[in-house]
C-alpha cells in the first residue's frame, strides 16, 4: 500500500519558504478538530504541552483529519525520545519541540525522529504510521519526510539561536511569545519592545541560516507584522480562542 503523506508537502512548503497559515487546536476533541480541518488552514497544531491531549486523544484527531488538506503538527509535551517515538508510531510526521535552548537539545529532537544510523528512533515493524506493516517503503522514506520545528522561548534559546538554527535536520524555528516574554521579565506582555526585538532577532537569525521561522499570533495586527518581518509559518488563532470569543459574543448579543 502507499502512504499518502510521502512526500511530506508541509515540509516541502517550509523549505520553499511558502507562507503557511495555521491554527492551534487545544480542545482535544476529534469533532472540533475535524471542523477545524475543513476551514482551509495549511497546518494545525495538536497541542500536547498545554492541552489535555495524550496518545488516546491524538489518534481519533488524526483520523478526523484524514481527509483534510491541513497538515497536522504535534507539539510534544517535552523533548523526550520515547514520547516522540510513540507519536511517530501513531502517525505524526510534523513535530514542534518546546523549550529548545541549545544545539544539543535540537540535535536530540532530530535524532529522536530518525531511524538508525541517522538517529535513535526505536523500530516497530507494525504500527499506525506504516499502516500496520503494509507500506513497503516506510523505512526508506520515513527519515526524510519528518519535519522538526524547534521552539525558542527563553533567553538561553535566544543566545543560542544561531547554533540551533544551523542544526542539521531542523526544518524551522518557532517562537513561543508568552514564555519568551516571561523569560525576559515581561510576564503576560509579549508586546513589550524588548520581547518584540527578541522575536525579530530570532526571525532574522533563522533566515540567515536558511531556515523558516514561525510564531503563534492570535491578534491579526501581530500576525501581519510578523509576516512582514519574514515569518512564513504563522498560527493565527486557536480553536479554543475562537470558540470562547464567538460564544461570548453570541451571549452578549442577546443578554444586553
Swiss-Prot record:
Query: What is the activity regulation comment for this entry?
Result: Inhibited by acetate, chloride and bromide ions, nitrate, fluoride, cyanide, EDTA and pyrophosphate.
Q: What domain of life does the UniProt record list for this protein's source?
A: Bacteria
One annotated GO molecular function is:
magnesium ion binding
User: Does the keyword section mention Cell inner membrane?
Assistant: no
* Gene Ontology CC: cytoplasm
Where Mg(2+) binds, per the record, is at 153, 179
Q: Which reaction does it catalyse?
A: 5-dehydro-4-deoxy-D-glucarate = 2-hydroxy-3-oxopropanoate + pyruvate; 2-dehydro-3-deoxy-D-glucarate = 2-hydroxy-3-oxopropanoate + pyruvate; D-glyceraldehyde + 3-hydroxypyruvate = 2-dehydro-D-gluconate; D-glyceraldehyde + pyruvate = 2-dehydro-3-deoxy-L-galactonate
Keywords of this entry: Cobalt, Iron, Lyase, Magnesium, Manganese, Metal-binding
Query: Mind telling me which residues the site (Increases basicity of active site His) is annotated on?
Result: 89
Location of the active site: 50 (proton acceptor)
For binding substrate, which residues are annotated in this chain's numbering? 151, 178-179
Q: Which InterPro entries match?
A: Aldolase/citrate-lyase_domain, GarL, HpcH-HpaI_aldolase, Pyrv/PenolPyrv_kinase-like_dom, Pyrv_kinase-like_dom_sf
- What EC number is given for this enzyme? 4.1.2.20
Activity versus pH: the note is: Optimum pH is 7.4-8.6. Stable from pH 6 to 7.5.
Q: What induces it?
A: Induced by D-galactarate, D-glucarate and D-glycerate.
Cite the cofactor comment.
Binds 1 Mg(2+) ion per subunit. Can also use, although less efficiently, Co(2+), Fe(2+) and Mn(2+).
Q: Supply the Pfam families for this chain.
A: HpcH_HpaI (PF03328)
Group of enzyme by EC: lyase
Q: Name one GO biological process term.
A: D-glucarate catabolic process
> Which pathway is this protein assigned to?
Carbohydrate acid metabolism; galactarate degradation; D-glycerate from galactarate: step 2/3
Q: Where is this site: Transition state stabilizer?
A: 75
| Quaternary context | Homohexamer; trimer of dimers.
Family affiliation: Belongs to the HpcH/HpaI aldolase family. KDGluc aldolase subfamily.
Q: What does this protein do?
A: Catalyzes the reversible retro-aldol cleavage of both 5-keto-4-deoxy-D-glucarate and 2-keto-3-deoxy-D-glucarate to pyruvate and tartronic semialdehyde. In vitro, can catalyze the aldolisation reaction between hydroxypyruvate (HPA) or pyruvate (PA) and D-glyceraldehyde (D-GA). The condensation of hydroxypyruvate and D-glyceraldehyde produces 2-dehydro-D-gluconate as the major product. The condensation of pyruvate and D-glyceraldehyde produces 2-dehydro-3-deoxy-L-galactonate as the major product and 2-dehydro-3-deoxy-D-gluconate.
Name of protein = 5-keto-4-deoxy-D-glucarate aldolase
The protein's gene is named garL
Amino acid at each position: 500500500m502507499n502512504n499518502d503523506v510521502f512526500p511530506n508537502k508541509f515540509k516541502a512548503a517550509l523549505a520553499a519558504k511558502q507562507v503557511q497559515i495555521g491554527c492551534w487546536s487545544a480542545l482535544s476533541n476529534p469533532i472540533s478538530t475535524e471542523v477545524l480541518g475543513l476551514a482551509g488552514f495549511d497546518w494545525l497544531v495538536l497541542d500536547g504541552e498545554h492541552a489535555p491531549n495524550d496518545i488516546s486523544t491524538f489518534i481519533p484527531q488524526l483520523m478526523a483529519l484524514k481527509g483534510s488538506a491541513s497538515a497536522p503538527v504535534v507539539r510534544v509535551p517535552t523533548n523526550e525520545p520515547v514520547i516522540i517515538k510513540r507519536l511517530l508510531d501513531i502517525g505524526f510526521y510534523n513535530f514542534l519541540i518546546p523549550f529548545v535552548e541549545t544545539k544539543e537539545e535540537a540535535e536530540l529532537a532530530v535524532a529522536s525522529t530518525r531511524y538508525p544510523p541517522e538517529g535513535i528512533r526505536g523500530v516497530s515493524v507494525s504500527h499506525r504510521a506504516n499502516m500496520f506493516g503494509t507500506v513497503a517503503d516506510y523505512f526508506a522514506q520515513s527519515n526524510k519526510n519528518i519535519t522538526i520545528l524547534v521552539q525558542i522561548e527563553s533567553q538561553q534559546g535566544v543566545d543560542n539561536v544561531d547554533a540551533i538554527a544551523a542544526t542539521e535536520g531542523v526544518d524551522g524555528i518557532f517562537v513561543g511569545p508568552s514564555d519568551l516574554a516571561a523569560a525576559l521579565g515581561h510576564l503576560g506582555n509579549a508586546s513589550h519592545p524588548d520581547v518584540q526585538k527578541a522575536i525579530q532577532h530570532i526571525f532574522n537569525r533563522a533566515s540567515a541560516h536558511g531556515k523558516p521561522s514561525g510564531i503563534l499570533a492570535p491578534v491579526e495586527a501581530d500576525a501581519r507584522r510578523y509576516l512582514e518581518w519574514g515569518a512564513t509559518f504563522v498560527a493565527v488563532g486557536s480553536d479554543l480562542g475562537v470558540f470562547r470569543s464567538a460564544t461570548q459574543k453570541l451571549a452578549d448579543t442577546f443578554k444586553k
